[in-house]
Amino acid sequence: MIGGFQSCFNRGNFCRRCCINYEDRNLPLPLSHIKVRTVVDHDKTVQEIKSNPNKSSLMGVVGESPLHELIGFHPILSLPGDLMHDFIEGVCPIIIMSLLKQASSMRLITYAGIQKRMENFKYGYFDTSDQPPPIQVKHLNNGHIVATAAQKPCIFKLFPIIFHDFIYHLPSFIVYKVLREILDLVLSYPFRKQWLPVLEDLCNTFNQIMILHFPTKIIPKAHFIREYERMIHDFGPSIKYWCFRYEAGHAYFKKIAMRTNNFKNTPKMLVTHYRLKQCFKFELRKFEVLALMHQ
């Protein structure tokens, strides 16, 4: 990993910003009671691992970062979390799936009814481009929402509208409402410093109600949400360093790989297609400029 941390999140000290243990993630510990990683402690840990090759990892650290010689870089200070993976592809789909399963267990709606509701829902003009596929019965059985990173926020945002007739009967709907407020704040740009205490209170509340309503669904990303107040304080608005735009580029290359059906030297093939696309765009701009000049 680029920071020299362990790549496994289901054991040990999985967090890169504090020293919480995986077994303690379900405990109602205030964030102020959890030891924060510091530059000095991290450097000592790295030196201890280098001096003892038999240690595979220590406090979630597996070794020195490949970028340790880069001026101004340090794994503790230079690696903020990613809003897209923590919220949009992490906790949000889990909460939606948990609420739908709770509604089914309370006999408010069946799995088949959920699928039919999603298939018949009419999306608005601004949501049609990111219209998600319907949540099918097999997805509910597997506990996994099949959608892209752009489609999952659409499901999360429209969830109270699609299932408006029974959501207020769910005892755990408060989890969705608090998470929705947190998401609205972390997506804000510009982000005002006066909002940081509000975000901190919401994140602490979210942790408490998750322990109360969905204790088995507290994954490491649910803990990462608690640290967004510190993260935004240190790095600024979270949408300035999220991976959403990189995912868009990744989707383009996946489409090219599937459409060409060429599996020999795939990197060269992808680079060639992308360079041709860029050349076409640049030449098109030249023609547009010439056309304007002649006019």
Functional labels for PLM-detected ranges:
Residues 1-151, 155-158, 163-165:
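Domain-level detector for long, ordered catalytic/regulatory cores in large eukaryotic signaling
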Residues 19, 111-295:
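Terminal interaction-prone segments of large eukaryotic proteins
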